[in-house]
């Protein structure tokens, strides 16, 4: 069954808006684990506007589920990942000033660089996922780079879901089938929500993991954190 990794960046945004350590992102991550999440995702950026590098170090010491670190593999990020040795690193080609991730890798054009990154992280025993648009050629390119998984950038699916969910999911099914055919694990993330999650998992039941942050933390303001984590897990289970 698809696993739920909760991105806690938005919790760090609230903390950083006031200074101090409230809310405590480590305490929140432990609570989210206790409420039933299968993993914790963080996306530290160079400007430290939400998750900071020290947060990542502190999280690795205490969480019991999988830690997934997302980010653009600049030198400082690579050094952090090799130091912390999470279960998974997800390589994302976002610019330093990007508000959020907005495109996947061109795994053909950047094959040499991505191959070197996969080789490096594998030496530390870290599973490597590459963030890609839902295009079979990008999925196959990730395989050629030596990745273990791809994460499909699901923003277009989420944006098109209300108007025509079948049309919205179609390119993702095609890309997911390409991943399965070439032996890649499969993740999904970006703008997945209570509205569109169940159908995504229903149509792509072999998806290994979804990473959800903004929508889940927003829903937690209305429903409470414990209830919200369990609501998302129920949406995933609908696809069984």
Residue ranges and their predicted role:
Residues 60, 103, 164-165, 219-240:
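C-terminal helical cap(s) of enzyme catalytic domains, especially alpha/beta-barrels
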Residues 91-98, 149-161, 206-225:
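Glycine-rich phosphate-binding active-site loops on the catalytic face of alpha/beta enzymes
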